[in-house]
Amino acid sequence: MSRIAQTFSQLSAQGRKGLIPFITAGDPYPEMTVDLMHALVKGGSNVIELGVPFSDPMADGPVIQRASERALAKKVGLRTVLEYVRAFRATDLTTPVVLMGYANPIERMGVDAFAKAASEAGVDGVLVVDYPPEECEAFAKTMRAAGIDPIFLLAPTSTEARIAQIARVASGYIYYVSLKGVTGAATIDLDAVAARIPQIRQHARLPVGVGFGIRDAATARAISGVADAVVIGSRIVQLLEEAPREQAVQYLTDFIAEIRQALDA
């Protein structure tokens, strides 16, 4: 059983919901990333999504775009991100780490070489935002062969056929994008999300995490009523962008603990 499957199995047995935070690797400071990952766990996260910086992050709003730019300016690329995971794994062998990013850096490294390097570093899942549907199957197969869960996005605009296709190739969990548009955008329509998740479950026997637009404990709590996990990205990246350097780790721990408390209430 993969680390991700094990995590969701334990959560289900405890009657709890998953908390999946996102941070951009290398932001706000490259030397802080591993400490931030540990802070996420300390606060009560179940899975970590680690963003791979990319020069044209088309699915991301201005907050995560700026984080990507800052990290790239400090020369943080895919190989550096894998080193962060390796360093994190030196003291944490249980928390799943999912790399989230775009196809270009993986294609440049080579899909097979990436699968091997990611597996050796201790990566558990990979979510590539911009792989077209027809390329998903080969990529997913390569990842699974390396012991990595291929994770895919579904959106309010996803057709029934697309949901069925993703259900066939995905493992780990499904990431449901609650809003049309980019990360960090408007507020969530809870009723629309609640209506959509049963459709996904008809096809996929995987946990469903919901992200985009979750900015506080109250929204996280509301979403957890209909989903298996909540994903929080832009709000965390913004918090780190604004935090004084020496307090960033503590700010992050406290914010995650607040969300965790709301999910467990």
Curated annotation (Swiss-Prot):
One of its GO terms (molecular function) is tryptophan synthase activity. GO terms for cellular component: cytosol. This is Tryptophan synthase alpha chain. It is an enzyme of class 4 (lyase). Pathway: Amino-acid biosynthesis; L-tryptophan biosynthesis; L-tryptophan from chorismate: step 5/5. The active site is at residues 49, 60. The alpha subunit is responsible for the aldol cleavage of indoleglycerol phosphate to indole and glyceraldehyde 3-phosphate. Tetramer of two alpha and two beta chains. The gene is trpA. PROSITE patterns: TRP_SYNTHASE_ALPHA. NCBIfam families: trpA. Belongs to the TrpA family. It catalyses: (1S,2R)-1-C-(indol-3-yl)glycerol 3-phosphate + L-serine = D-glyceraldehyde 3-phosphate + L-tryptophan + H2O. It comes from the Bacteria. Keywords: Amino-acid biosynthesis, Aromatic amino acid biosynthesis, Lyase, Tryptophan biosynthesis. HAMAP family: Trp_synth_alpha (MF_00131). Its EC number is 4.2.1.20. It comes from Ralstonia pickettii (strain 12J).
